Every structure is written in structure tokens, then in C-alpha cells.
């Protein structure tokens, strides 16, 4: 019985080892001839619009917001390694024709083009979708404790968030976004009361970990004041999507801050 158990464990470890090295194995044993035939500019078979530019180990897309992706061909399958790894079954490949099946099961037909003017579609690539975007809100607030000057400023950081989506051919592609930092400065008659730079990680006790990993701090703004405090909303959400969490910040005139989920 012990011998069978040991053998079973060894088999499982061997299978796990094979799975862990499968990507590296595929790359080292890739179909170099198929890869060479893919080099160049490809257009959609139906309308001749530029679809992708293959150069070396990378595929570039005409949408300037889409990140280039590494690729290889192994056993008649085109593998794309972006945020996620996907394989697309090649149905037919010739020097000027490529047919493969996308993730929806639809056939994609691409034709190689020698039109050099189409290369301009691949000449520009943005670093991130929201690079250099800033938001500011300066507000004078009247309360029972006097006037407060609220300064909110939101700007991008160097922290990257990758969001996967699908292009017109049903192929998964990646867009890169930069996370934001929200700065709050609160003064009472010119005297500093509260100052802090907020990042999304500070709200991990209120937001699921997986969601927080895929999201950015999108907005922060003043909402209202009462006799005891000033209130702000912080919006954390998936880039370019409606899915968000809203956190309410409560700042008292003596500089104490608390937060809760709306």
C-alpha cells in the first residue's frame, strides 16, 4: 500500500513539474519556420484594415493603447503571452495567409500585406491609457467652526495596472493604466489641519483583495460638512468600467480621520 502511495505521489509530482515547465519547453521547441512566416504586417481578410505587425518575438497592434505581446508557435498553436497566456489553434498557415480560431470559436482570417503605408498605424504607442491625467478640487467650506480651505489633487503614479479586453478579432489584448494618488490638504483660517496622500492600498480592509489588485484609485472629492466633520468620497474601481467601491472619509476639525464603505 505504501509503495502504491509513493508511486502515485511521484507521478503527481512529475505531472506538476511538466506543467510548470510547459511554457518554457514550448518556447525552446517552437516552430521556427511558422514563426518566420508570421513576420510582417497582416490585415483583416474582409476589409484589408491593419490587424497586427509581427516583428521578432513580438506582435504589435494598430490600436496605440494596446500593449505589444510576446508570441511563439508550438504544435500548430499560436501562443500569446500577455497578462494571461492564451493559445489559438492555427487552421491554416501559408506565406501570405493565416487562419486561426479565436476564443469564441470563430475563424479569424488574416492576409499578409506589403503596403508600407500601413505601417504608420503601428508607429505610435501610448505608455498608459491615463498618463498625465490630473484632477483638482479647491473648495472653501463654511462650518460652525469657521471657514476651511480644502485642496484635493489626484494624479498618476508609476504603479501599473493591466486590464485585459478583446479586440475586434476576438483576441485577448492588454491595456495598461497607471494608478493614482489622491492628496488632501485641509486648512482652517490658513492653519494646516490635515494633510495626507491616499493610495488604494490604504483601503484594503474595506475592499476585496482581488478587486483591489485590478483597480485604480479613480477619484476623490469633497461632498459635504456638518457641525462635527468634513466628508469626502474616494472612488476605487476597475479602469474604464462601471464597477466601483466608494469609501467615505470623515475628517474632524482637529485632524482626525476615519473611513467606511458607502
What are these regions (language model features)?
Residues 106-165:
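Surface-exposed beta-loop interaction hotspot
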Residues 26-50, 125-141:
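Tryptophan-anchored aromatic micro-motifs
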Residues 44-88, 173-191:
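N-terminal glycine/threonine-rich, aromatic-flanked beta-hairpin/loop signature
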Residues 19-25:
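Bacterial lipoprotein signal-peptidase II cleavage site
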Residues 206-239:
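Acidic, glycine-rich flexible loop segments
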Residues 14-17:
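C-terminal motif of bacterial Sec signal peptides marking the signal peptidase cleavage site
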Residues 98-99, 148-153, 228-237:
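Short beta-strand elements that form the blades of beta-propeller/WD-repeat-like
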Residues 193-212:
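Surface-exposed loop and turn segments in beta-propeller and other repeat-based domains
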Amino acid at each position: 500500500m505504501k509503495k502504491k502511495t509513493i508511486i502515485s505521489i511521484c507521478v503527481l509530482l512529475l505531472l506538476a513539474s511538466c506543467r510548470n515547465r510547459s511554457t518554457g519547453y514550448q518556447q525552446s521547441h517552437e516552430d521556427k519556420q511558422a514563426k518566420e512566416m508570421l513576420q510582417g504586417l497582416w490585415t483583416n481578410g474582409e476589409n484589408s484594415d491593419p490587424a497586427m505587425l509581427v516583428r521578432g518575438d513580438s506582435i504589435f497592434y494598430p490600436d496605440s493603447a494596446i500593449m505589444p505581446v510576446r508570441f511563439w508557435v508550438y504544435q500548430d498553436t499560436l501562443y500569446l503571452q500577455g497578462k494571461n497566456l492564451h493559445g489559438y489553434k492555427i487552421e491554416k498557415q501559408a506565406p501570405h495567409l493565416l487562419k486561426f480560431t479565436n476564443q469564441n470559436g470563430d475563424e479569424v482570417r488574416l492576409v499578409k500585406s506589403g503596403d508600407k503605408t500601413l505601417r504608420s498605424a503601428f508607429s505610435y504607442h501610448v505608455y498608459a491609457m491615463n498618463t498625465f491625467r490630473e484632477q483638482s478640487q479647491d473648495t472653501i467650506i463654511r462650518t460652525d467652526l469657521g471657514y476651511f480651505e480644502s485642496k484635493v489633487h489626484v494624479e498618476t503614479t508609476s504603479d501599473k495596472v493591466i486590464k485585459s479586453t478583446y479586440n475586434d478579432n476576438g483576441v485577448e489584448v492588454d491595456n495598461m493604466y497607471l494608478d493614482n494618488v489622491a492628496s488632501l490638504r485641509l486648512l482652517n483660517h490658513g492653519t494646516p489641519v490635515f494633510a495626507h496622500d491616499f493610495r488604494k492600498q490604504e483601503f484594503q480592509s474595506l475592499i476585496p483583495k482581488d478587486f483591489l489588485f485590478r483597480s485604480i484609485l479613480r477619484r476623490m472629492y469633497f461632498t459635504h460638512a456638518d457641525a462635527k466633520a468634513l466628508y469626502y468620497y474616494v472612488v476605487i474601481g476597475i479602469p474604464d468600467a462601471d464597477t466601483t467601491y466608494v469609501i467615505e472619509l470623515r475628517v474632524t476639525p482637529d485632524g482626525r480621520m476615519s473611513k467606511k464603505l458607502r
